[in-house]
């Protein structure tokens, strides 16, 4: 058992009432598996050091005594069950959540989903303002991604991992190469988002906590984390504690990965292992686009249209019948936004739509923010077009 780490909630000096309704987490509550796969994939792609980026989505069953913040977390859940919103105002949503959380923590084993990557830079530290590790754990409304062409900014997307945790608890561990010394360095920390409460000493606490060294500090020694959090190669692991293990979760995540990263997969820039049962690579992607269970999972998660659209874009990308064009594109009030490649496939049954990709990732099917919806082409024969920037 790790005994020199602590779970610390911020003091609630203002006495504010903070419930479970965290805006970031709620954003992904309707599509938790799809969102967690997409957002984590974008972060790993942005951190690519060499190809292909290899990502794994693996379910572990961790013994309760191997979860270092277990006792503190259970104690906090009990405090949250004593909140007035639960005991007096009969907030059934909060009561149901914390009752379920208590049940999970009282089990002998706790489900944990690990989302890990390799062939990346890892979450570069140290754990100070201005570094990616700090931005992910403690940043709000800031970006420390390495490039303006990055596909995210550790913004609201980082909350997707909380949406698949029935304990609203996520732990992070990373191994990266220190730029000044060239030495591989380790960092780990955890974050918890519950509700404001009164602790066992009668001190008012906010809903957010960090697990690590005392004083909200990140862990920098492998010896101070359990074995399942250790890293042997450069990269990052994100652990959603109390993972919500619903039926077909693997296929829902696979649908998101195919929808979003099909170009990166074909170009051998990314590979995905989902629960050691689904292995998505350049050689297997066609098979999984035709997999009936993945297609059904896309329907169930409300992403059927996106999945089928990406499937058509994938056909356009790999087909020898597709035709390539180059064009400078301008936007009203902006002027030229650069040179783009437009790849077009004409074939009966295609949806007459245009898809935009960047850095090997599907971004959108329209430019409505630039006054160019590109959604309806009624007078054209069936086609699909794939647009990507060349500069």
Predicted regions and their residues:
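Short helix/loop capping segments that flank catalytic or ligand/cofactor-binding pockets
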Residues: 49, 65-68, 123-126, 163, ...
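Surface-exposed acidic, glycine/proline-enriched linker/cap segments
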Residues: 77-102, 138-145, 196-228
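Short linear interaction motifs
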Residues: 16-22, 34-40, 91-100, 109, ...
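Beta-sheet entry/capping signal
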Residues: 52-56, 111-114, 159-160, 168-171, ...
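Flexible ATP-lid and adjacent glycine-rich G1/G2 motifs of the Bergerat
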Residues: 85-183, 187-194
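Bergerat-fold GHKL ATPase/HATPase_c domain
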Residues: 1-116, 124-134
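N-terminal assembly/transducer modules of large multi-domain enzymes
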Residues: 2-15, 25-35, 45-49, 202-391
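Flexible phosphate/Mg2+-sensing switch loops adjacent to catalytic phosphate-binding sites
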Residues: 51-72, 170-215
């Amino acid at each position: 058992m790790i005994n020199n780490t602590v779970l610390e909630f911020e003091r609630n000096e203002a006495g504010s009432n903070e419930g479970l309704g965290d805006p970031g987490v709620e954003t992904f509550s309707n599509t938790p598996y799809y969102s967690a796969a997409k957002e984590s994939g974008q972060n790993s792609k942005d951190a690519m050091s060499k190809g292909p980026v290899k990502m794994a989505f693996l379910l572990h069953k961790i013994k309760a005594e191997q979860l270092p913040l277990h006792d503190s977390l259970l104690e906090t859940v009990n405090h949250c069950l004593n909140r007035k919103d639960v005991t007096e105002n009969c907030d059934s949503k909060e009561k149901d959540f914390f009752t379920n959380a208590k049940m999970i923590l009282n089990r002998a084993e706790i489900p944990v989903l690990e989302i890990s990557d390799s062939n990346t830079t890892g979450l570069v530290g140290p754990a100070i303002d201005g570094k990616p590790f700090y931005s992910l754990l403690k940043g709000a409304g800031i970006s420390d991604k390495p490039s303006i062409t990055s596909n995210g900014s550790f913004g609201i997307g980082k909350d997707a991992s909380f949406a698949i945790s029935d304990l609203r608890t996520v732990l992070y561990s990373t191994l990266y190469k220190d730029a000044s010394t060239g030495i591989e360095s380790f960092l780990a920390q955890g974050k918890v988002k519950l509700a404001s409460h009164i602790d066992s000493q009668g001190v008012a606490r906010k809903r957010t906590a960090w697990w690590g060294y005392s004083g909200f500090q990140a862990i920098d020694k492998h010896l101070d984390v359990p074995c399942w959090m250790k890293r042997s190669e450069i990269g990052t692991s994100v652990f959603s504690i109390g993972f919500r293990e619903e039926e077909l979760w693997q296929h829902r995540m696979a649908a998101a990965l195919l929808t979003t990263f099909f170009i990166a997969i074909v170009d051998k820039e990314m590979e995905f292992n989902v629960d050691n049962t689904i292995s998505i690579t350049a050689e297997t992607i066609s098979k999984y686009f035709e997999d009936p269970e993945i297609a059904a999972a896309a329907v169930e998660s409300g992403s059927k249209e996106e999945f089928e659209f990406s499937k058509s874009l994938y056909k356009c990308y790999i087909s020898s019948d597709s035709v390539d064009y180059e064009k400078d594109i301008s936007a009203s009030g902006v002027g030229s936004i650069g040179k783009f490649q437009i790849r077009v496939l004409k074939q009966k049954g295609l949806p007459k739509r245009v898809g935009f990709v960047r850095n090997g990732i599907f971004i959108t099917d329209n430019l409505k923010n630039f006054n160019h919806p590109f959604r309806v082409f009624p007078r054209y024969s069936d086609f699909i077009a794939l647009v990507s920037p060349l500069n």
